Amino acid sequence: MTSVRRGNSKQSVKTISVVMAFLLVSLSSFSQIGEHRNDLSIGINGGYILSNVGFTPKVPQNFHGGMTMGVSVKYVCEKYFTTICSLLGEINYASIGWKEDIKNAQEQPVINTATGVAEKYSRTINYIQMPLFAHLAWGKEERGMQFFVQAGPQFGLYLNESSDSNFDIEKINIDDRSNTIVKQYSMKVERKFDYGIAAGAGVEYSVPKVGHFLLEARYYYGLGNIYHDSKRDYFGKSNIGNIVMKMTYLFDILH
């Protein structure tokens, strides 16, 4: 089992490397045959994140909601026929985690015997997230609307975490739960560095001398785990997943 999990970790690193190499090769290919651009813009972004953690053994969950905000930098390097090619990087604060769906065998809320109310538990984990995207767009270059897609690696640095529950962990109603996995309640994040793949799509509206307004939806799949995953460890998998909806405002520095 240990060798399998180590193999998964190596495969994740290989996946990140392949994606980064593909992005660099793709942009390099465009640069050799496209129309050169040298446009740089910076700005701010903000939005809402729906997140969960993919546990093995499984922990039933609903989405955890949280905010994200940060700074964005976009460099437009080429136009290849109708495709506008850019690099987009961000440094964001993100509040993510998981929210448990605690039910009994009849799919009803589990009532805590000590408090008399339905048990609730969520964990919030705050990160600095740093995605780097190959950004491909089609539409108006100077004034008007563009549609874009983007994909690339994302890295995360752990800041802190907090739990929110309405019961004493020592007095859980474990007998009525359809899922009895509760080890996570006493475990803090063990791996402080997160990495994975992100991809998204959206629209951008540009107004000369005013700036660029972007609206997008994005998905992130973590290739690392928040807990150790050797044969001796409890969880074999504990990777983060995010659905992000955000707006970005950029203004030109070079054009």
Model segments located where?
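Short glycine/proline- and aromatic-enriched beta-strand/turn motifs that initiate or cap beta-hairpins
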Residues: 32-74, 252-255
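Predominantly the C-terminal beta-signal and adjacent terminal strand-loop region
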Residues: 37, 194, 199-255
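Extracellular/periplasm-exposed beta-strand and loop segments of Gram-negative cell-envelope proteins
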Residues: 53-63, 96-128, 158-194, 225-242
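Short loop/turn motifs that connect adjacent beta-strands in outer-membrane beta-barrel proteins
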Residues: 32-39, 78-85, 139-146, 207-212, ...
